[in-house]
C-alpha cells in the first residue's frame, strides 16, 4: 500500500527569453572580453618597454665590482653591449678582504699598488661582453707586498655596439653636439698614438712611436668637460691631455660617445636637471650649418621614445590609477559616441518631419498650374522654331507677329487668366482680379 507522500510543487514556469534580449546582452560581454584582451596586451607592452628602459639604465650607469686574492672578478654586460673599463686598482685594503689590520702594515698600504693594473684589465676585458679574471699578484706584475691581503677594484660601463666615434688630430678643436632634449654621455676616450695606425693624422715628416703611447686619462678630462651637456668643444693638445708619447710624435684624440634622452639621463643622475642650458652659439659652430631654404624648427628626434618610456614607467608604478584613468576615458568616449548618435537620429527625424510638412502645405492646384505652364512652354518652344529662324534670317531686332499669331496669343492669355481665377477660388481668396491684370488687355 502506497502512502501519500508530500505533494510535489509544480515546476515554476521560467520566463521565455526573447531572442532580441539576448542580442542586447551579448555586445556588453564582447566589449568586456575585448577590454580584458586590450589590458593584457597593453600590460605586456608596458613590461617590455619598462625592460627596455632598464636596459638603457644599465648602459648609462657606472658599474663597480671587486674581488679578493684567489677569487674571480666577473664583469657582465647585457646584450648588444660591451665592457668599457673606466678605472682599475689592485692593492691593499684590510677593510675589504681582511677583518684585522696589523699595525706594522699601515704605512705600506699606500705603496702596495700595482701600476700595470689598468692596462692588464684593458687587455683582458675591454670590448668584451663578459669577462672572468683571476685575482692574483702574479697577474699584475711583481708583488710589492708579499704576504699581505690585496684586492682588485674595477669600474666599468656597458657601451652599446652602435655608438658615435670621432677622431681629432693634435692642435685641432673637438666639437661634440647633440640635438634638443638629448645630452652627451662619454663612454671612452684615448689620447696618443698606436704603432699600427699610420693613416690617421699622418704626415711625411712624422715620427712614428716605437710602441703604443696612449693616455686613458682623457676620459676623465672629457667627462668633466662634456658630460651632461648638449654642446662641448675643447682644443686637443698636451695642455689638456698630457704628453704620453715621445717628442715629435703626432698624436690624436679618439672619443666614443652617445646622445642620451634627457629623461633617462636625469633619472640616473639627478644633478643633470640642475645644469643651466648652454648659451646659443653662432651659425657654423659645433658643426651646425643652418640651411636658409630648410626648416628652422628644431628636430625632435627621440622625444617621442623618451616620453613614452617615462609614461610607461609611471603606469607601471601606479597601476590602479592608470586602470582608473583608462576605464574613465573609455566610458567618456562611449558616452560622447552615444550622444552623437542620438543627436544625429533626432536631427534626421526632425528634418524628415519638416520635409513632409512642406509637401502637405503645397496645394494640388499648384501642381496643375506648373504642369500647364510646362505644356505651354513646350508649345511655345515648338511653335517658335520657325519664326525664330525667320527672324534670324531677316536679321530684325524687333518681333514680327501676324494676325494668326496675335489671335493665338490672346487666346493663351485668356486661358491663363481662367486657370489663375480657378486657383484663387479653390484657395478661398478674393476672386477679384488684381489691378495689374488689366495691363494684358
From Swiss-Prot:
Residues 344-441 are cytoplasmic. PANTHER family: PROTEIN EVA-1. It is a single-pass membrane protein. Belongs to the EVA1 family. It is found in: Cell membrane. Residues 1-23, 362-391 are annotated as: Disordered. InterPro entries: EVA1_dom (IPR039500), Lectin_gal-bd_dom (IPR000922), Lectin_gal-bd_sf (IPR043159). Keywords: Cell membrane, Glycoprotein, Lectin, Membrane, Repeat, Signal, Transmembrane, Transmembrane helix. It comes from Pan troglodytes. Binds heparin. Its main location: membrane. Residues 7-16 have a biased composition (Pro residues). Residues 1-48 form the signal peptide. This is Protein eva-1 homolog C. The gene is EVA1C. GO terms for molecular function: carbohydrate binding; heparin binding. Residues 67-159, 168-260 form the SUEL-type lectin domain. Glycans are attached at residues 62, 165. It comes from the Eukaryota. Pfam families: FAM176, SUEL_Lectin. The chain crosses the membrane at residues 323-343. The keyword Transmembrane helix applies.
